[in-house]
Amino acid sequence: MRNARSAGHTGGMSENGSGVVLAVSLDGSHRFSKVPVEEIRLREGWGVDGDAHAGVTVQHRSRVARDPTQPNLRQVHLVHAELFDEVDAAGYAVAPGELGENVTTRGIDLLGLPTGTVLHLGESAAVEVTGLRNPCAQINGFEQGLLGELVGRDADGDVVRKAGVMAVVLAGGAVRPGDGIRVELPSGERLPLRPV
């Protein structure tokens, strides 16, 4: 398995440096899509206040069914808006929050970041990237055929997952559309993202 960056899909985005928050979304229920809002509040070690996926232990239903004591590595879901541009060209109209993400970004190659990258959002919030979102069949329930655009294979036959990244909250704070994002790459060995 290779991530999108190793498959050559940087799309002109920055893999270190900076980007911007395009939208923020949350939902207190376990629905596929989230509702765009003016602001979300991140809480250290917890996630997005008021979001169904916030918590110290796993909150995603499939993971709770397997082992409810697992640490929650999916407190915050981030998707790059460049993905919306890509699927729009294939005939799928997707708006911020509709893929279930809490933070929609622009200008950062999220999929090309190594595990452990810290994203500084706005004035004080920070999240650590834990891995790739593993797209599931619910995506086709949202829009038939979209899953095929979010999971594919590269020229070497390796699986490419494009549905964003998951993170845990290191430092709390408010995050709003228009906030800057600063990328802090991990020191030492840089491990590629894997599904979490």
Q: What is the meaning of each model-derived region?
A:
Residues 2-196:
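Metal-cofactor-dependent catalytic cores
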